[in-house]
Amino acid sequence: MKLSMITCTGTGTIGEYTVTKETTMKQIDTTQLDAAACQAQAAEYHARGFNCAQAVACTLAPAVGLDPQVAFTLTEGFGAGMGGMTETCGAISGAVAIMGFVMSDGMENPKTKGQTYKLSREIAKRFGEKNTTTVCGTLKGIGSDKGPLRSCPGCIDDAIEIACDVLKQLAE
């Protein structure tokens, strides 16, 4: 697979985080980041049996030059809150996996992870603000008399919307 690369320098603010773009970042095709279209694609994937992480990552993969099949296999264990443990929502994990792919310079330069962490925190922060939590079990209402706070399809929609916004900001 051939990846398109762009060299980015400078800084930008995404949410409360300043992201330093001094890395060779994967090219982001913003024409593939229409949130409504991405949400529809992710919903189709989820309806076919993809877990929440897979639905998000496979939907966003083409926009960043990642093979959706690779995204699918890499995120298989992140569903149902990390391997069924109902911890961090899989939809968030799928979005974070895409940010890692975009920002990482690879094994030769492991110093890019700090920038990826900032983007990961921004995604989790926005998701938590929208849903009051990032924990799968709490979102699903497991162990609660109140029922679910947000359905899996709703969580996928939210993660897609947030990730599309962050990716568009990175591409600016």
Regions of interest found by a model, annotated:
Residues 2, 12-24:
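Short, Lys/Arg-enriched N-terminal segments with co-localized hydrophobic residues
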Residues 24-48:
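Polybasic, low-complexity association/targeting segments
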Residues 26-32, 59-77, 130-137:
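Acidic-glycine-rich active-site phosphate/pyrophosphate-binding loop
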Residues 40-47, 78-86, 143-149:
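A short glycine/serine-rich beta->alpha loop
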Residues 63-74, 101-119:
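Phosphate-handling active-site elements
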Residues 94-102:
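DPxDG-like acidic metal-binding loop motif
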Residues 115-172:
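C-terminal binding/interaction regions
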